[in-house]
Regions:
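Conserved GHKL (Bergerat-fold) ATPase module
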Residues: 1-403
Length: 403
């Protein structure tokens, strides 16, 4: 009799067996065989619910990114069973796009065996199951973040981009659901931090969540405005994926703290004395700024002073809805002609280069002012990680000014 019971039990699908009777190795082997993966899953999620949506689910967070995950060829979906009989190998309607990496099996006794794909899409039971699974997956991911940080950071490296796309792609509709799962690199702590961790450590006088977007954390940390933010004792999120800034712009704020791109608009971090000095310098050098703007021939909307640049002579900022990093991302897309940020050239009134500009202008040397303007603009582009329009002309300009 004992042997017969063993045999019968082994015929029960793994997702229907009590969790305390299944070893971790059994779950891992099932996952690898069923979903043709060579790595163990990062997390196994089991769920049995009764009531409005009655089902049993066995889900897995993969330990590595499928080779085709970020391509059009990737098919999301969970294997859907009705009373132990598979009715669909990949039911996409059970998963929202932002959780499309989840693999697994869902078995329900409430579904008909001969239900068609078209009927299934309209099935209210399926919608209830999807909503329930969405909450379960979110809670399990957050539990992994809290209780197993190392595993969560592996998950984030593999699939964090998809979570960010989920916020951006749905126009921020799911920011409350997904916001506390987000991680970004901290300039202060030199590691990934959550938005909750960032907000908890904000000094009382800090009003915004500051971020910089670009290709490389080292370069971003050296930006003039990054140095300014850090010098005030504030942390800075360094965003290096193309979706990052779009995601944060769509969220707008987190825990009532607005997201602020350090290279878009006025940061408002100058002291009262610096403000007064800047206003005086703006008035005093109005003609010089007009001349520089004219020399740059439409490349910048405005030229102004920025007294907070410390040792940097120049920087670029952007006005309006498109930042300089967004311009870079959008220009890589098809049909992106004419996509451009509205740039502002900001000069450090306390730098020796500014003194040289003023001297050339006072002496009426318009040729030198034009060369300095072009040089400073190109330098500001390089600092911002943007390509200069004519590298040959830039090299000749530098050599000419050195002679």
């Amino acid at each position: 009799t004992y042997t017969e019971l063993e045999t019968l039990n082994s015929m029960v699908p793994i997702w229907k067996r009590p969790k305390n009777e299944v070893k971790d190795e059994d779950y891992n082997e099932f996952y690898k065989n069923k979903f043709m993966d060579y790595t163990d899953p990062l997390r196994v999620i089991t769920s049995r619910t009764e009531g409005t949506a009655t089902y049993t689910a066995l889900l897995f967070i993969p330990g590595s990114t499928p080779y085709d995950y970020y391509t059009k060829e990737y098919e999301k979906g969970l294997a859907l069973y009705a009373s132990g009989v598979m009715i669909m190998e990949k039911c996409a309607d059970l998963l929202p796009d932002y959780f499309s990496f989840v693999k697994g099996v869902v078995d329900s006794e409430d579904l008909s065996l001969n239900i068609s794909r078209e009927t299934l899409q309209k099935d209210n039971q399926l919608k209830l199951m999807r909503n329930s699974l969405e909450k379960k997956i979110k809670n399990e991911l957050h539990a992994m973040l809290v209780n197993d940080r190392e595993k969560y950071e592996t998950f984030w490296k593999n699939f964090g981009r998809q979570i960010k796309f989920g916020i951006y792609g749905d126009y921020g509709m799911h920011k409350d659901l997904l916001g506390d799962l987000l991680m970004f690199y901290s300039a202060k702590e030199k590691k990934l931090v959550t938005l909750d961790e960032y907000v908890e450590k904000m000094p009382e006088d800090q009003k915004c969540i500051y971020f910089a977007a670009g290709d490389d954390t080292d370069r971003l940390g050296k930006l003039p405005n990054a140095q300014l933010v850090l010098s005030k004792g504030y942390d800075l999120l360094l965003c290096t994926e193309d979706v990052d800034e779009f995601c944060l712009q769509m969220m707008r704020d987190y825990k009532e703290k607005e997201f602020k791109n350090i290279n878009s608009g006025d940061l408002g971090l100058e002291t009262e004395d610096e403000k007064k000095a800047a206003e005086a310098a703006e008035t005093e050098n109005k003609d010089l700024f007009e001349e520089i703007k004219k020399d740059l021939n439409g490349k910048v909307k405005e030229v102004k002073v920025n007294p907070t640049l410390q040792e940097h002579p120049v920087t670029l900022s952007a006005e309006g809805g498109i930042s300089m990093e967004m311009e870079k991302v959008l220009r890589r897309m098809p049909n992106a002609e004419g996509v451009e940020s509205t740039k502002v050239l900001e000069l450090n009134p306390n730098h020796t280069v500014f003194a040289a500009l003023k001297a050339a202008h006072a002496a009426g040397d318009t040729d030198k002012v034009a060369k300095y303007a072009e040089l400073l603009y190109d330098q500001a582009l390089l600092i911002a990680g943007l390509p200069i329009e004519d590298p040959v002309a830039y090299a000749q300009l530098v050599c000419g000014l050195m002679q």
